C-alpha cells in the first residue's frame, strides 16, 4: 500500500513538467492522465501504485526495478499493473502469476494497494 499527496504531484508537474513525467511515467500513462479533468489526481494514483508495487516486489529502486518498469494500464474494467524489465524479472522470481491493484482518491490523497498472487 502507498499513499501520495495530490498537491505534491501537482507541484512536481508545475515545477519539473515533462522532465518529471518522462522520468516516472510511461507514454501510455501520460496520455491517459492528460485526458482526465483532474490529471494530478490520476498521476498521483499511478505514482502511489508504482511505489506500492515496489514494496510488494521487495526491491524499492534496486535489482533493475525503475519507475517505468511498473506501468498502470486500463484497457477495459479496473486498472491493472504491467511489469517490464527488472520489475518483470523480480515478479517472476517471486513466483507471482498475477497482481491485483486498487486505486482510490480523496481530495488530498491518492491511495494504491497492490497484491502479488500465485495461482
Protein language model annotation of sequence segments:
Residues 1-119:
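Core catalytic alpha/beta fold that binds nucleotide/phospho-ligands
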Amino acid at each position: 500500500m502507498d499513499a501520495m499527496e495530490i498537491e505534491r504531484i501537482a507541484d512536481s508537474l508545475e515545477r519539473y513538467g515533462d522532465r518529471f513525467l518522462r522520468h516516472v511515467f510511461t507514454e501510455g500513462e501520460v496520455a491517459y492522465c492528460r485526458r482526465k479533468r483532474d490529471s494530478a489526481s490520476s498521476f498521483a494514483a499511478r505514482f502511489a501504485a508504482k511505489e506500492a508495487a515496489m514494496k510488494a516486489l521487495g526491491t524499492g529502486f534496486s535489482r533493475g526495478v525503475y519507475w517505468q518498469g511498473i506501468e498502470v494500464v486500463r484497457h477495459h474494467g479496473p486498472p491493472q499493473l504491467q511489469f517490464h524489465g527488472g520489475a518483470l524479472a523480480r515478479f517472476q522470481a517471486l513466483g507471482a502469476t498475477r497482481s491485483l491493484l486498487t486505486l482510490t482518491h480523496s481530495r488530498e490523497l491518492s491511495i494504491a494497494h497492490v497484491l502479488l498472487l500465485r495461482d
